[in-house]
Amino acid sequence: MTDIKFCGLKTGRDIAAAEAAGARWTGYVIFPKSPRHVSPTLAGELCHLARTSETVAVTVNPDDDLLAQIRDAMRPDWIQLHGSESPQRVVQARAYAKRGIIKALPVAEASDLDAANPYDRVADMLLFDAKPPAGADRPGGLGHGYDYALLKSLQISVPWLLSGGLDDTNVCAAVAAAGAKAVDVSSGIESAPGIKDAGRIAGFASALAAC
């Protein structure tokens, strides 16, 4: 069975739909440039609604002050670092926030996977996302995919998630190509940027279950 992280949730209805679809993780984005942004306070309120999923605070190059806000207001199970954080910063963030760390890494070509090695055993999990287009003002693939088969040759010891451009039409092929045991989806379950669709959430989970 392939585990799912439904990311960018903003309402209790989103959480209910994600957990009904079997989410292992639910993600809450704390980054003002994202259409999925929620404040640490709202993220904390949402986390209290999560009953069966592990909660993930998704951040981009957070300073210690923001990490403290997330830790205290949200109390997530995980913190996802989705910026240019160094391995040393990952170590510092884990020690400061006292939470498991998911480090996101951008992928466009095979050489990008070399960046994973310094984070192996430093982060608790890795997440491979599409490299953002040139000139983008925020990280992530922004709904775009990449050659998922590049991940088939990964040689790392920590668990990892496949992300970037996934939806119900391509998730089976992507998982097979990458050899992934867990996936992350956000824009692929939306009716508009930042607006989750319960039907698409259920459809994504059903498509993955049928692989």
From Swiss-Prot:
EC number of this enzyme: 5.3.1.24
Catalysis: reaction(s): N-(5-phospho-beta-D-ribosyl)anthranilate = 1-(2-carboxyphenylamino)-1-deoxy-D-ribulose 5-phosphate
Amino-acid biosynthesis keyword on record: yes
GO BP annotation list: L-tryptophan biosynthetic process
GO terms of molecular function: phosphoribosylanthranilate isomerase activity
Disulfide bond annotation, renumbered to this chain: none
Entry-linked SUPFAM superfamilies: Ribulose-phoshate binding barrel
Pathway: Amino-acid biosynthesis; L-tryptophan biosynthesis; L-tryptophan from chorismate: step 3/5
Protein name: N-(5'-phosphoribosyl)anthranilate isomerase
Native organism: Maricaulis maris (strain MCS10)
Encoding gene per record: trpF
